[in-house]
Design a protein with these regions (language model features):
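Structured, active/binding-site neighborhoods that engage oxygen-rich ligands
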Residues: 1-262
Length: 262
């Protein structure tokens, strides 16, 4: 995202995903690519183009990795172009696109200074646009229905009851129609206590690490670094060999350049 100015080169992305998995396997971390991403890379290796390699990818991989695009690209049509380019290689289905559009829009809204309530509304609007992209796929209407319910439902649900809500209404599996609404439910329920919301999401079962990653992206965008304790940041940076502040600054520079060109 940083190297390309917000618009991802799909073949470069494919190569970097494959290289990353090789590095993880070499470090003893096992196979970490999701099923949709793996099938897409196999399709590319077999000669299929990026417009068709992800036509069965309906899981949450695109939504999970889309936050940097939301940071780098301001709200508007250009954001949707960037999200589609970042997603279709592996997740070119309506349900996966809707999920990725939702998370990216929520993050972009938050980075622009908006709060959590506005981020959820931005996510709903973007998901409806994303649902028109990619191959029509089962679960799309269910994802939209669950997202539309969130503002009204969460107004009646206490933070202590959000786990029950997620288990009963959204689910937490790797399919987009469960994990994306679950992530946004945790983010909205947490309010200003981003750390509590993130810990609840990470304890939800199912694909909870991905749910927490998406929730954390939205919370961080809307609340800033103060949402999470410094020791948590330090642990993530140490374990992953990354300086999150530098990455954030570089993504912010991309966003500023794009805003200057509008």
């Amino acid at each position: 995202v940083i190297r390309s100015g917000g618009i991802i080169d799909e073949f470069a992305l494919a190569g970097r995903l494959a290289d990353w998995e090789d590095e993880m396997v070499a470090q003893g971390s096992g196979e970490l690519l999701g099923p949709s991403t793996r099938r897409a890379l196999e399709a590319l290796a077999a000669g299929f183009g990026p417009e068709s390699s992800g036509r069965t990818g309906a899981t949450n991989g695109a939504a999970m990795r889309i936050a940097p695009v939301g940071i780098a690209v301001p709200p508007g049509p250009a954001l949707f172009v960037a999200v589609e380019r970042a997603s279709r290689l592996t997740h070119n289905t309506s349900v996966a696109m809707a999920g990725a559009f939702a998370v990216a829009a929520a993050v972009s809204h938050g980075v622009g200074g908006g709060g959590l309530a506005g981020a959820i509304q931005a996510a709903i609007t973007a998901a409806e646009i994303g649902a028109e992209r990619g191959q029509p796929f089962v679960g799309t209407s269910l994802l939209l229905k669950r997202l539309r319910r969130l503002p009204g439902d969460l107004a009646k649900v206490s933070p202590s009851s959000v786990m029950d809500y997620v288990n009963d209404v959204t689910g937490t599996s790797m399919v987009s129609e469960e994990s994306v609404p679950a992530a946004l439910a945790f983010a909205l329920a947490g309010g200003t206590d981003g750390w509590l919301a993130l810990r609840m999401a990470a304890s939800a079962g199912g694909d909870c690490d991905t749910v927490a990653a998406m929730a954390g992206a939205v919370l961080g965008a809307c609340l800033g670094m103060k949402a999470f304790p410094e020791e948590a940041w330090s642990l993530v940076e140490a374990r992953n060999g990354i300086d999150l502040a530098i990455v954030g600054e570089e993504l912010a520079h991309v966003r500023a350049a794009r805003e200057a060109d509008r």
